[in-house]
């Protein structure tokens, strides 16, 4: 072993090595530790050259051709691996993003489903939800409304669409998440009605709704987003949307079989409307669009609606010769209907808040079956309406002019003020809505006897209904709807011989001290009613009013909501009652319901009921 000289790092004194002793300076006593130095031996040959040095030439290594060939292959494999990995990650992300909701989560939507399927407190099944074909959800008058049908309106033009209104005040404070509608897998029509109370969801898809043919967007919903909702855009036939750019407008061309289009909002920068002629549109609805020149190219249109327009050039309407339905609302620069002469197939005309100076172009128009004039301005109708002999529906509201006699042999549905009734001869009339709020705020039931086929009567606005007993001579009259109506012949009203459904909203009844008796009426609604007993004070306390209705022994359903009802003792004789709507009252005791053998549904939300357990388990309680 070779040794090196050691000097003390402190005093520089010479340190001598002694076997098995630590290194210690003899001068300052500093101890030193040495780390063993391990030596590695390398077996190698060293060539020594003598003489004149040769030129310094660096030898090149041989090029490895296999390695050069393999490098790009490895790079390609790495790239493909990265691409496949990224694709899988993207696919997984999309799968997560497109995961759909199989059961609604909002309480209000679940309540609606439980009710229409008679589930009581049980959750609806996926199969039941999938059976709904048509669904429209909207928030109106602080209440949720659901229009629904179990029939497909695309295959059954007569599909019955029912309306369900939520009465619970707490439920009506809630919003519905758009993603909840993913659970309705059997829908062909989904309408979110541009409603603000429906919260949009970031990750929503309706691609699994394979039969969806019609969609109405929610509030301010981007069409760029809506366009991705459908797995097969060729199935879509109806859209109600907003358009904010020409690029969004161009997306409509991806829906080759689109037949009906409603543009509920269009941004000012949108101008490329002429591309719509590439679609086979049959129905078009526009709002707040002032340039209508491009309409001339849509010669196959059968239905057109224009709402709020400052347009001044209406010549394109002359080209719409196939039009069957036309609705114009607040198109204030339109003064004449000359273009109507080019619409020989027109069946329905709806004019609201218009400044038309005359309607002569409508005279003797045999194709017209439906006419609605709402606040038509200063136009004079006179005998024009009488010349429309094919009319089946007529609505005249907000019109203060005069009319001549109207003979309408085919008219089945009419809406007009009571002063026009003496001039209306319509022997086939079945549905009549009458306004009695003007100077002649009275309607005599005897005036209705000339409509022997009348089935439904609706009386609107504040007025007096007299001659009620005459209605017994109308054998088909089964439904009466009354709004803000005053009655002095109340006993006659509640003893009508043929009426099975009576709806009274904000009605005032004058009665004597004798309770009513009725064994014909099946459905009764009383909302915000008042009763004057004899010549005494008007009574609004519901518990004093309801004993007068104890003799309605044939009732199947009864509705009294948003009131102060406390006692249910009055309905002890209602042995046929099946459905009670008593939401938002002050009921605490339901003992009187125990002996009602046919009671199936009880709506009692908003009441402080203390003894609900006494009711039969078969009664569905909401």
Predicted segments, located by residue:
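Residues immediately within or flanking Cys/His clusters that coordinate Zn2+
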Residues: 3-5, 22
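Short cysteine-rich clusters marking metal-coordination/redox-active sites
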Residues: 8-11, 25-28
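Short, non-ligating residues that shape and space the ligands of small metal-coordination modules
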Residues: 14-18, 34-35
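Short Cys/His-rich micro-motifs in 6-15 aa windows
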Residues: 28-39
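Alpha-helical transmembrane anchor segments and their immediate juxtamembrane flanks
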Residues: 60-89
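Surface-exposed cap/linker segments adjacent to membranes
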Residues: 92-123, 139
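Concave beta-strand-loop units of leucine-rich repeat
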Residues: 134-180, 186-205, 211-226, 235-248, ...
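Hydrophobic anchor residues at the C-terminal helix/turn of individual leucine-rich repeat
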Residues: 181-184, 203-206, 230, 252, ...
């Amino acid at each position: 072993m070779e040794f090196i000289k050691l000097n003390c790092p402190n005093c520089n004194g010479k340190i001598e090595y002694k076997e098995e002793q630590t290194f210690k300076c003899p001068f300052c006593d500093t101890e030193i530790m040495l780390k063993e130095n391990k030596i590695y031996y390398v077996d190698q040959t060293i060539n020594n050259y003598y003489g004149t040095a040769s030129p310094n030439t660096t030898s090149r290594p041989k090029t490895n051709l296999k390695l050069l060939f393999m490098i790009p292959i490895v790079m390609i494999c790495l790239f493909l691996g990265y691409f496949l990995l990224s694709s899988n990650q993207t696919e997984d992300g999309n799968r997560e993003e497109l995961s759909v909701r199989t059961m609604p989560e909002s309480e209000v939507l679940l309540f609606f489903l439980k009710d229409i399927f008679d589930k009581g407190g049980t959750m609806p099944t996926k199969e039941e939800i999938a059976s709904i074909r048509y669904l429209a959800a909207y928030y109106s008058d602080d209440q949720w409304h659901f229009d629904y049908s179990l029939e497909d309106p695309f295959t059954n033009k007569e599909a019955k669409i029912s309306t369900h209104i939520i009465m619970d005040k707490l439920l009506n404070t809630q919003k519905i998440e758009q993603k909840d509608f993913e659970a309705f897998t059997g829908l062909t029509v989904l309408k979110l009605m541009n409603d603000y109370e429906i919260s949009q969801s970031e990750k929503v898809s309706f691609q699994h709704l394979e039969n969806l043919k019609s969609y109405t967007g929610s509030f301010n919903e981007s069409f760029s987003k809506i366009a991705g909702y459908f797995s097969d855009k060729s199935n879509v036939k109806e859209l109600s949307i907003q358009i904010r750019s020409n690029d969004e407008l161009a997306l409509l061309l991806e829906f080759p079989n689109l037949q009906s289009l409603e543009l509920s909002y269009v941004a000012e920068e949108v101008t490329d409307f002429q591309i719509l002629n590439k679609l086979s549109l049959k129905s078009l609805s526009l709002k707040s669009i002032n340039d209508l020149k491009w309409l001339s190219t849509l010669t196959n249109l059968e239905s057109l609606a224009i709402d709020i327009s400052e347009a001044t050039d209406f010549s394109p309407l002359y080209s719409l010769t196939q039009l069957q339905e036309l609705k114009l609302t607040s198109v204030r620069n339109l003064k004449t209907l000359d273009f109507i002469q080019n619409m020989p197939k027109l069946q329905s005309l709806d004019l609201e808040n218009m400044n038309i100076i005359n309607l002569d172009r409508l005279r003797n128009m045999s194709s017209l079956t439906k006419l609605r004039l709402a606040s038509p301005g200063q136009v004079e109708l006179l005998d024009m309406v009488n010349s429309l002999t094919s009319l089946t529906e007529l609505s005249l509201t907000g019109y203060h002019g005069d009319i001549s006699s109207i003979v309408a042999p085919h008219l089945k549905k009419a809406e007009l003020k009571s002063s026009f009734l003496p001039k209306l001869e319509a022997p086939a009339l079945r549905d009549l809505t009458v306004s009695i709020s003007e100077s002649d705020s009275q309607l005599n039931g005897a005036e209705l006897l000339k409509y022997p086929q009348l089935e439904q009567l609706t009386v609107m606005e504040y007025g007096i209904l007299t001659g009620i007993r005459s209605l017994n001579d109308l054998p088909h009259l089964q439904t009466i709807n009354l709004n803000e109506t005053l009655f002095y012949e109340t006993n006659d009203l509640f003893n009508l011989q043929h009426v099975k459904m009576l709806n009274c909203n904000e009605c005032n009844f004058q009665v004597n001290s004798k309770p009513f008796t009725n064994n014909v009426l099946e459905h009764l609604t009383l909302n915000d009613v008042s009763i004057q007993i004899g010549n005494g004070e008007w009574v609004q306390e519901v518990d004093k009013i309801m004993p007068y209705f104890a003799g309605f022994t044939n009732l199947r359903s009864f509705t009294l909501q948003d009131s102060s009802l406390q006692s249910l003792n009055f309905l002890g004789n209602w042995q046929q009652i099946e459905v009670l709507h008593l939401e938002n009252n002050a009921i605490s005791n339901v003992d009187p319901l125990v002996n009602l053998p046919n009671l199936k549904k009880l709506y009692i939300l908003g009441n402080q009921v203390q003894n609900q357990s006494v009711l039969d388990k078969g009664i569905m309680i909401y």
